[in-house]
UniProtKB/Swiss-Prot annotation:
Belongs to the amidase family. InterPro entries: Amidase_dom (IPR023631), AS_sf (IPR036928). Its main location: secreted. It is found in: Secreted. Substrate binds at S242, T263, S264, G265, S266. This is Putative amidase ARB_02965. It comes from Arthroderma benhamiae (strain ATCC MYA-4681 / CBS 112371) (Trichophyton mentagrophytes). Glycans are attached at N120, N217, N326, N430, N528. One of its GO terms (molecular function) is hydrolase activity. The active site is at K161, S242, S266.
Length: 592
């Protein structure tokens, strides 16, 4: 076969975007830096680890990984029930040279990697695993043995969205072959913070290509590089996006937790559809250095986890100022709040919670969602919250008809993407701006153009307004009004609210405009009899699909929102009640 064929070791599920057209013997093995040589053992842990156990693992109360929390995993690690190596060990050996045309891959997978291998050919949540994961896990185990713990997440495996660059053997592609093989001079700041806290970056998650900012006729969770991500509650379920794989991986217990990114809904919406907690931080609370951008005004990096407390643990790690991202200089506190301590079951008591009903009325929401939302309000009221009705976003009707929010993203992308491409120390296809990116995409067959168009880029280039253009500032001021006085901030001030709530699928739009935070928590499920709708092959609505509730707050109010979300979560325990059509069966006990 002519041309480079990228063969990804997708966690036991061996496939690429073109794998269906190729036999296994046709495919060379490539890393981000080139092909592996003959008879080479890929360093996922070829040697046997020597593990010192403090107690008999069979005597341990080891949690099921689909619901395991950071505290439970850390307790097992501390007691010696299992090690970080146990959580990530995998060996992949290339036995016969490719040039002889007979490649045999033997995969020995354990625990999280085994879980990924069980389901990834169906859900495609993870694009690759870190060849150095075992080495890092061993290091964390050795530090633990010597009495050194870097923090409460020491030794826990995490998967991060593939638009977050890492300076290691993994690829960072934003789902596109245009920057496959591109390198930055260092890890993204959030990745550095994860490593410093002792987390094992085990792999990268699939996502909507270019964070859903390429096409108007593509599907959520699709990318040329990773294929089509699907969620786990109904076959071919739309995972939403753009942090699609991060949502699915967290839900299925394919890692302790995941990182996603959001411009408008890209954390909370896939979290909603995968029945997990998603926390979109205030823009500037977490660094975006070496994260593929859309908009400097709206992009943010945040945690996606199975519980509010685990999301709080992860936010604690990644939050903070970074001289390489000037938006973080706006952080108003010298010390990052204790987000984990904010997890208080009584946090709803006495809090004023607003309900902007006009958003539901204007955008519309299925009656079953409204009914379950009203039941959630009743739970909060019973927990001591003061529910304040009709705290409307006064400019929402105008916002819903305005092209300005999209125009801001078009202008930012025309400026921010070239600035990012300029930072690449390796840029294999010489992608320098949106025009060259579009040209590559339209001429590379793996990018599936024109069946998946480039309409968003076409519009941005046609408009030609960058965020440095004099025309930009008046547009931006109007946009800010939609989110500020006419949106969430105005509602909070007028009604003296601690937070506002909406069904999650209605919550992202206004906070996106001003960079304010949201946290989504599982709330319920679409019942039997729900009409099944499709977008191409994906099921966008139907029985069994999760429903979440979004808590929206003031800038820098994550501490308060986490408390409210935690109290609601503990009063409802909605997540464990839902059934999936697919989930992995491998557990820690099975490999000890």
């Amino acid at each position: 076969m002519k041309g480079p064929i990228t063969f990804l070791l997708q966690l036991g599920a061996v496939y690429t975007s073109i794998a269906s057209a190729c036999k296994l013997s046709d495919l060379p093995i490539l890393s981000a830096h080139g092909s592996y040589g003959s008879n080479q053992c890929i360093a996922f842990g070829g040697e046997q680890a020597v593990i010192d156990r403090l107690i008999d693992p069979q005597a341990c109360d080891i949690p099921k990984l689909i619901e395991a929390t950071a505290d439970q995993l850390q307790d097992g690690l501390t007691k010696g029930c299992f090690t970080s190596v146990d959580l990530v060990k995998v060996r992949i050996t290339l036995q016969t040279p490719y040039r002889q045309g007979n490649v045999l891959i033997i995969v020995v997978v354990q625990t999280y990697v085994a879980r990924i291998a069980e389901v990834n050919s169906t859900v495609r949540a993870v694009t690759e695993i870190n060849p150095d994961a075992l080495t890092i896990a061993k290091q964390m185990d050795n530090e633990r043995k010597m009495g050194k713990l870097r923090g409460p997440l020491h030794g826990l495996p995490i998967v991060i969205k593939n638009n977050i660059f890492t300076d290691d053997k993994m690829s960072s592609t934003a789902g596109s072959y245009a920057i496959f093989g591109a390198r930055t001079s260092a890890d993204a700041t959030v990745a550095t913070k994860l490593r410093e806290a002792g987390l094992v970056i085990m792999g990268k998650s699939g996502a909507s290509q270019w964070a859903n900012f390429r096409s108007l006729n593509s599907t959520n969770g699709w990318s040329a590089y990773g294929g089509q991500v699907t969620a786990a509650y109904i076959k071919n379920q739309d995972p939403s996006g753009s942090s699609s794989g991060s949502g699915v991986a967290s839900d299925l217990g394919l890692a302790f937790a995941t990182l996603g990114t959001e411009t408008s809904g890209s954390i909370v919406s896939p979290a909603d559809k995968s029945n997990i907690v998603g926390l979109k931080p205030t823009v500037g609370l977490t660094s975006r250095r070496f994260v593929v951008p859309i908009s400097e005004r709206q992009d943010t990096v945040g945690p996606m986890a199975r519980s509010v407390k685990d999301a709080a643990y992860l936010l604690q790690v990644i939050a903070g100022k970074d001289s390489n991202d000037n938006y973080t200089s706006a952080i108003p506190f010298d010390t990052i709040p204790d987000y984990v301590k904010a997890c208080d079951i009584n946090a709803l008591k006495g809090k004023r919670i607003g309900v902007p009903r006009n958003v539901i009325k204007i955008f519309g929401s299925p009656q079953t969602v409204v009914d379950q939302f009203n039941q959630a309000l009743a739970v909060m009221k019973k927990a001591g919250a003061i529910i304040v009705e009709n705290t409307d976003f006064t400019s929402f009707a105008e916002f819903a008809q305005s092209p300005i929010p999209d125009d801001i993203l078009y202008a930012d992308s025309l400026t921010n993407l070239p600035a990012f491409f300029k930072q690449l120390k390796v840029n294999p296809h010489n992608i320098t701006d949106l025009e060259s990116l579009r040209r590559f995409t339209q001429h590379h067959r793996l990018e599936e153009y024109p069946s998946r168009d480039t309409a968003r880029w076409d519009i941005a280039l046609q408009k030609g307004i960058k965020n440095t253009d004099p025309k930009f500032w008046p547009m931006y001021q109007k946009n800010v009004k939609f989110g500020n006085e006419g949106g969430i901030l105005g509602a909070l001030r007028r009604h003296k609210l601690d937070a506002a709530v909406l069904p999650t699928d209605l919550s992202p739009y206004i906070p996106a405009l001003i960079g304010s935070p949201i946290i989504t928590v599982p709330m319920g499920v679409y019942p039997n009899g729900t009409k099944v709708n499709h977008d191409r092959e994906l099921v966008t609505s139907g029985p069994g699909i999760p429903i979440g509730i979004g808590f929206m707050g003031d800038l820098w109010s994550e501490e308060k929102l986490i408390g409210l979300a935690y109290a609601f979560e503990q009063k409802t325990h909605a997540r464990p009640k839902l059934k999936r059509f697919i989930q992995p069966k491998k557990e820690v006990k099975g490999i000890l």
